[in-house]
Design a protein with these regions (language model features):
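Positively charged n-region of N-terminal signal peptides that target proteins for export
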Residues: 1-5
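Glycan-processing catalytic domains of CAZymes
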Residues: 30-378
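Bacterial N-terminal signal peptides
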Residues: 8-21
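Bacterial Sec-dependent N-terminal signal peptides
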Residues: 19-35
Length: 378
């Protein structure tokens, strides 16, 4: 996953904590009921805000990299690579809302455990631009915390994120703001175990209530574990409210190198069924639009990268992938909070997953998914 790239961009010093995870055995806390199920499926997409870093003399940044802008230039959005040009955020919101999307899930980064906080904050520029956009209320939004946590920065994360929950267009299920943690296992290890993580989440909830945001729904990003079906039990012990994924590319991989896009649908289904069947926690499914991080891997060879990619994506195939996901949600109403579904992704153009209209393809992907959303939500 490219989040490993993000961790490696910056030179930072993490404080070292002993990991003392408590046992997953014994009596579990009651699992919350799945709230907010309605007839319509609410489709959103993950948003990666890596497109506004200061550029070099050639216009390149870590993410707007030379190979991406040349060999893979077909991925360039119609407004160009940068998301911070005047009017671009307004344009993006209109494209998303006009084509049936209900919300974005912003990748959000705390800047405490890094040497260069200002550079890290560039990853949150898109969220700031979104909240300043005149048409922001056309979409709901939520946050996914993507950077390591520890007792050092936990309260800061709480205090920085709780105010967002009070925004009028913050994504809620039955009035409860939705918050996700990308690096869930690192949260547990960073907080020194399950018991401390549970206490930290309780503090988070307390701060939200005291700020007037009410009760919150806290999600744990996870992945399938066929060799250990009970792997997700620890998230129940910690007090997370639901599970989700960011993408399911690894689950569809059949070999190194090129894999047909049909394999990604199989990976998505493996995630939806495999995770939800082995956990009592509610589950929000993710539908993939592609995965191919070769441009970043080629430009940053010292960073970890996947050895595979998907080919054969078309607007029609992506739309049918979404249809399968929406039908899964409707077939499993007791498992999915708020009938939510995430698409991976709105703008992971560097990772090979995007819905943004491009100079090469126009808005064909958006037009195709719009029709599916309308059909499935009749």
């Amino acid at each position: 996953m490219f989040r490993n790239f993000i961790y490696a961009i910056f030179s930072f010093l993490l404080l070292v904590f002993s990991v003392t995870q408590s046992s997953c055995q014994g009596k579990k806390d009651p699992v919350p009921e799945v709230p907010g199920n309605k007839a319509a499926v609410k489709v959103g997409a993950w948003y990666f805000g890596g497109w506004s870093f200061p550029a070099d003399q050639n216009g390149h940044t870590f993410h707007i990299s030379p190979t991406l802008t040349t060999t893979f230039s077909d991925r360039e959005p119609v407004w160009g690579w940068r998301e911070d040009k005047a009017g671009v955020m307004t344009e993006q919101i209109n494209y998303a809302a006009d084509n049936g999307l209900s919300f974005w899930g912003f990748c959000w980064y705390d800047n405490t455990l890094v040497d260069d906080a200002k550079t890290m904050d560039n990853l949150n520029n898109a969220l700031d631009l979104f909240l300043k956009a005149p048409n922001k209320n056309r979409l709901d939004f939520c946050l996914m915390s993507c950077f390591p946590v520890s007792p050092v920065n936990w309260e800061k994360i709480c205090d920085r994120t709780v105010p967002y929950f009070k925004e009028g267009n913050y994504l809620k299920v039955e009035g409860k703001p939705v918050m996700v943690f990308f690096n869930t296992d690192e949260v547990i290890s960073g907080m020194n175990g399950i018991a401390n993580t549970k206490a930290a989440l309780q503090l988070y909830r307390k701060k939200a209530r005291e700020a007037g945001a009410g009760e919150i729904l806290i999600g744990a990003r996870t992945a399938t574990r066929p060799s250990d079906p009970t792997y997700q039990n620890k998230y129940v012990e910690c007090g997370f409210d639901f599970l989700t994924t960011y993408n399911n590319a690894d689950d569809g991989r059949s070999n190194a190198g090129a894999n047909d896009y049909s394999r990604l649908l199989e990976g998505d289904k493996k995630s939806w069924n495999g995770i939800s069947a082995h956990s009592a926690l509610p589950f929000v499914p993710v539908v993939g639009t592609g995965y191919d991080m070769r441009p970043w891997a080629l430009d940053h060879p010292n960073q970890p990268a996947s050895d595979f990619w998907y080919t054969g994506m078309t607007p029609q195939k992506i739309a049918e992938q979404l249809r399968a996901g929406m039908q899964w949600v409707k077939a499993n109403p007791k498992k999915v909070p708020g009938n939510l579904l995430f698409l991976y992704a709105w703008n992971e153009n560097g990772e090979g997953a995007w819905l943004t209209p491009t100079k090469s393809e126009g808005a064909a992907r958006l037009n195709a998914i719009k029709q599916v959303i309308q059909d499935e939500n009749k």
